[in-house]
Amino acid sequence: MGQLTKKFGKIDVSLPIPHLLNLQVDSYVKFLQEGATERRHDEGLEGVFRSVFPIEDFNRTASLEFVSYEVGEPKYDQPECISKGLTYEAPIRIKVRLVVYDVDEDSGNRTIRDIKEQEIYFGTLPLMTEKGTFIINGTERVIVNQLQRSPGIIFEHDSGKTHSSRKVLYSCRIIPMRGSWLDFDFDHKDILYVRIDRRRKMPATILFKAMGMSKTDILDYFYKKEFYRLDPMGRLMWEVQKDMYRKDSAFVDIEDGKGGTIVKAGKPITKRAWRLISEAGLETIEVAPDTIEGMFLAEDIVNPATGEVLAEAADEITASLVENLREAGISRLPVLHTKGLETSSSLRDTLVLDKTPDMEAAQVEIYRRLRPSSPPTPEIAASFFDNLFRSADYYDLSPVGRYKLNQRLGIDQSVDLRTLTDDDILRAIRVLLHLKDSHGPADDIDHLGNRRVRPVGELVENQYRIGLVRMERAIKERMSLQEVSTLMPHDLINPKPVAAVLKEFFGTSQLSQFMDQTNALSEVTHKRRLSALGPGGLTRERAGFEVRDVHTSHYGRICPIETPEGPNIGLIVSLTTYAKVNDFGFIETPYRIIREGALTDDIKFLDASREQGEVVAQANAAVDADGKLADEYVTARVRGDVLMSHRDEVTLMDISPSQMVSISAALIPFLEHDDANRALMGSNMQRQAVPLLRSEKPIVGTGMEGDVARDSGACILAEGPGIVRYADATRIIVSYENGLYPDRGGVRAYDLQKYHKSNQNSCFGQRPTCHPGQIVKKGDVLADGPGIEDGELALGKNLVVAFMPWCGYNFEDSILISERVVKEDVFTSIHIEEFEVVARDTKLGPEEITRDIPNVGEDMLRNLDGSGIIRIGASVKPDDILVGKITPKGETQLTPEEKLLRAIFGDKARDVKNTSLKVPPGIEGTIIDVKVFNRRSGEKDERTRNIEDYETARIDKKEQDHVRALGDALRDRLADTLVGKQIAVTLPGKRKGEVLAEAGAPMTRELLDALPVKRLAGLFKSREVDEMVDTALEDYDRQVAFLKGIYDSKREKVTEGDDLPPGVIKMVKVHIAVKRKLNVGDKMAGRHGNKGVVSCILPEEDMPFFADGRPVDIVLNPLGVPSRMNIGQIMETHLGWGAKELGRQLAEMLDSGAAMATLRHEVKDVFRSATIAKLVDEMDDETFRKAVSKLRTGIVTKTPVFDGASEEDIWSWIERAGMDGDGKTVLYDGRTGDKFYNRVTTGVMYILKLHHLVDEKIHARSTGPYSLVTQQPLGGKAQFGGQRLGEMEVWALEAYGASYLLQEFLTVKSDDVTGRVKMYEKIVKGDNFLEAGLPESFNVLVKELMSLGLNVTLHQEEGKKRPKRVGFMSAL
């Protein structure tokens, strides 16, 4: 029975949140396609192999074809890979076929001579864990999804910024997934240019001609024609065309042929007049003789008598040209339809600028522009041009690119066509011309319809392709160098290029990141992150404001709140709670469909492009009892704008108010009352919360806590309906009923992780939440992870808070905290540090891990065992030896006395130095684990043997528990059949003379449980029953044998030794658990961006207290609220106070023996929920008592974002709990007992301890390492460095005239090498006088000047005395 929970949400969310790791896991499953080879789709790994193979040699005499691939089983499981520093990977085997051909020299036809098929080992491929991570070299890493510009087409303009005339210049770009980019842009003279691969621009018509179009074809495609007749009388007649409207004035009266006038001379021709002209059936209209001057010819004009070309297409028409044509007998002129209409003459002007006569010349010109160094021939140029956009080998638009092209240009092509067609290019130019001429809006490149997600599967796929292409070159070279007929496929294929590319990607790529494993939330968030950075993406220096800003299309897809605060702001974002990524990589969000103002149960996921034009109502729109929108006008979104729309126009409705934010932001209660900047900090800081020793879920939650905890992978969940057979702190065994794990009899064992080190050194431990015999269903939590309680995220603690100043200790966001919190380990966390020591084979001899260390006292060795390794459970502090190690020293020059001693005692073996592993400063804790790794062939020491014995015993026990659970599951399955059946033989007991059951007695359940499983064979009188039992026992034996095989391989791995790097003899890893109590200087935070540093830990008795004597836990500064505008923390405080007090009151009623009926009525009255009322009525008294008892620490409330508790709800709870409605209380000063002058806002707030711990930041140095060049101390804790004294600090000391102090700081304490040595000698002698020398930085400056050719020499000035020596104390 779980806790009684008050849910304040009013909106019923019909759609469960999709699994939070689906994006990562599904993408890699799709990439790997581990199933049957025959059914694989041409995508992912299969698609990569198919795109590169077949590989043919240069002469086409041999071809290497791909058949299939198989993914093998990984050699080591995940825990082994983490512990041994290995990569969790599986071997890939590919089946390839080498086909050798005979080529006929005359005809060139090929006939198959030989076919060889072979399966080849093709390296390994990292596998994804079920948590969506990769284990690379023993550390868990995440491949972050990349958000990049989608392939396809985009139309843009420069907003008048490029040219000084401020003219808006339009451009168009076609972006493929792989291949040459194609750019079309206009200049300020309206000439259209094309750029291929961002090279030099050329007139766009060159590209059209290279595609095979003539001048006339180009003009016909882009322009309509109109025809003019040249009258011998000198008149100009325009031929009427129905589909062409002339925006002009009448030259003469236009008559309808029946005596009526349609338009009078000089009057404009309206659309109505145009209709009348068409109806009148007029063929021509007389226009002004100069009308066509300045227009352009649509075709070449040829003299019909002589065949001479009188004028070319695109030539400008002049009065003289018209006269010449009339004289040549030309009566009809085809003219481009451009004047005064939407279509401008820009393309005709481009054509005039283009001097290439035909297709061949155009292709050669393109080749010359793109390959300026190599001389072109027409054949090479034609082949090169064909490969640019038309060849699938060189150009891949991708299904996404084709989909976007179809969508934008209105084409109906299959998404499988992944090259560019001539029609695509021509249509793109037509749209570009229309945009320029109509001054239409450009595409928004920041719109999510133009940005897509490249998930992990696609990123790995691209890397695999790069590796295969490199391998392809090597294979082709081998084929041409050797006689192919004598080779086998494995002689040609070398998978090393692929392995190298994968290793580089997973190890060093910007998108392969060390997983943030601070807590369960940080893990999930890291896997749901989208990055615009990385290869093929943006750089943070070049990214402008627009790409970082929140966009209207982000609604429901990308969280507007959660993003880093630094230079990456807006470039790294998170998916929202309900968002999914479709097959094309576009982010989709779900909506409920509305028809005629009524809600339906249909839900559809839409990407940003498909949402355009939809009218979307908000999730909180009022709905009546019939499921219709209650208000006539509702707030709705249309193309990113928020409008009031009529309910009949609304087509969709949001699923949930939380669908617009990410999971981190959805965990902040009353998010709607927080300023966005503080909400951003709140969502980021929850990821930094350290899991505590005892987790406690928030009293005021949002309802998302369970989803995050369950989907994070930190919990263990039941995979189906079943029964828990065994449960302890380290292991849970469950037998499932629905056919899961048939080879194991439906029994699955879960090993719980204990004191496991996370990537951030926090302690990862799991606790069982189930008990043996418990019946579970799918999704039930079997074990909690770190920072999780009862399957809900629990990152902090519920503390009683007071908002009041306290003697300046909470000035500037400082925090005053009660000593009770430290004393009761409320905020104590465990951190695990790992230390490693390696014994190598050196030139002077092997290093040795031993207890026998020269010049080390027994006191330092007290915790080491015989092998020189520290025992588990020992408490250690800085400078303690963890592992004793000695290293051979080089031969040193010996004195005659030492030579004599060596000769007498033979003490050669002592020529070693102590290189033991010691505890570094700042670490104090307990040894929790030691791992010893030996070479396979190496000799094992005593500690290794002890570890192996211990591990083997553990595996034996696990096997016994597993087999026992298998037997219990078998008994349960047989019980219904066997109980009541007669036994054929008498069953003796364990003791002498004891009889369990006589022959003929019926089988009982107790007897069935008491008998060993094997004893059931041949036990019953019924032959049918015996046969059924025998069949079941055969299955049982097979399952036991299967388990034995698994556990035998585990035992073998324990004893087989390890693969260590070359030169390494032995490696020891020591884990120390460090307990970090809350300390002054630790950073703490709430969930609303309210962060601060602990300034004082006050004794409990001095803290402000309530009238009943209870002290508060934490005191915060009230001035931290108004200016930050995060009022959500105040609302949380008030609601938390009401929930805590009401819960306490109900528990007190229970303790005081109140009648059950009264208590039930009181609980129903507090919760005011039909669901809770029904649940309370169904509970028996004992279950009800337990449920009410759990309310003692407070009623757990769920207040979802944008749909949470209202002010009225909070006030009603506070008043019901018997407190003042304003949430303020009288507090008393703990030091004096006096009442504080003003009443104070108090309540319960959820407080987190962040991983910025003072114990891990502070350190001290006396002497230590120095920089080689400057001889100044190094900086930072990791280098055991010093504190830098900068120029501002020097100014401060100068201002006080502290000359001796300054001299000491700038010389002996910094980089005066000789002065340091002298200082040490003087301190030893007790002669405390400072004698400063020349700082090394001065020498560095001199050398730098020398490098510039300036010779610098130092001279002692004559007659100058050295300054008088002054003692340190007298100087002060």
Swiss-Prot record:
This is DNA-directed RNA polymerase subunit beta. One of its GO terms (biological process) is DNA-templated transcription. It catalyses: RNA(n) + a ribonucleoside 5'-triphosphate = RNA(n+1) + diphosphate. Coiled coil: none annotated. One of its GO terms (molecular function) is ribonucleoside binding. Belongs to the RNA polymerase beta chain family. Its EC number is 2.7.7.6. The RNAP catalytic core consists of 2 alpha, 1 beta, 1 beta' and 1 omega subunit. When a sigma factor is associated with the core the holoenzyme is formed, which can initiate transcription. GO terms for cellular component: DNA-directed RNA polymerase complex. It comes from Nitratidesulfovibrio vulgaris (strain DP4). Keywords: DNA-directed RNA polymerase, Nucleotidyltransferase, Transcription, Transferase. Pfam families: RNA_pol_Rpb2_1, RNA_pol_Rpb2_2, RNA_pol_Rpb2_3, RNA_pol_Rpb2_45, RNA_pol_Rpb2_6, RNA_pol_Rpb2_7. Disulfide bonds: none annotated. HAMAP family: RNApol_bact_RpoB. DNA-dependent RNA polymerase catalyzes the transcription of DNA into RNA using the four ribonucleoside triphosphates as substrates. InterPro entries: DNA-dir_RNA_pol_bsu_external_1, DNA-dir_RNA_pol_su2, DNA-dir_RNAP_su2_dom, DNA-dir_RNAP_su2_hyb_sf, RNA_pol_bsu_bac, RNA_pol_bsu_CS, RNA_pol_bsu_protrusion, RNA_pol_Rpb2_2.
